[in-house]
Amino acid sequence: MSSELPPLEQAKRIAAHQAVEQHYPKDAKVVGIGSGSTVVYVAEKIASLPKELTKDTVFISTGFQSKQLIQNAGLRLGCIDQYSNGDLDVAFDGADETDPQLNCIKGGGACLFQEKIVAECARKFVVVADYRKQSKALGTVWIQGIPIEVVPDAYNKVIADLKKMGAQSAVLRPGSPGKAGPIITDNGNFIVDAYFGEIQPDAVKDLHIKIKLLLGVVETGLFTNADVAYFGNADGTISTITK
């Protein structure tokens, strides 16, 4: 581990490296690489593996950032549209928040639709993050709201529907500084961030279904299918949650 990294980055790195060490198959054929600051270290670790473990492996990205990570690491890039449920050996991805039952909020980087496709197609979904992303209930740490990808023509209706459902706030996510208008996803859609307060672990799946059924919603940032999560701690240890 590099002592030059700030403590938070060291925490991310140890979690990512251990996750790869314990879950990257020796005979991997297709592997998903997600988005976010911790996944940088997933790509770093995979790139350091013996070439015989990666030379025949196809790596699937969840967006522009992870595509660059794969290419910069000299790994073989594939497209998710060639694969279906169970075709990926494993997928590694970050999370904005994770509860004790491995429910996650994802989509802070606006790649939630692609992230969910990759996660759904993987036989094992591994979450990597730092200690700040672990909580007793979703909405405790990540208070920006559940990211929801929405068809542009329906965003006002979806916001109104979310508030009727009980969202304390529901707002259209603005673009980055210097960009006029809202953020646009890789699919040409908008992101609405809806905050429902603390969501008890047993209520996450039901809330996801209710939001997903709203006309105009493409996908929600509620993930309920993780198999294991690794959290790098400030003291250099790693905490894990498994099913």
UniProtKB/Swiss-Prot annotation:
Q: Which reaction does this enzyme catalyse, per its entry?
A: aldehydo-D-ribose 5-phosphate = D-ribulose 5-phosphate
EC top class, as a word = isomerase
* Any single GO CC term annotated in Swiss-Prot or TrEMBL for this entry: cytoplasm
Ordered alphabetically, the record's keywords are: Cytoplasm, Isomerase
Q: One MF term in GO for this entry?
A: ribose-5-phosphate isomerase activity
Give the similarity note.
Answer: Belongs to the ribose 5-phosphate isomerase family.
What is the official name of this protein in its record?
A: Ribose-5-phosphate isomerase
NCBIfam families cross-referenced by the UniProt entry = rpiA (TIGR00021)
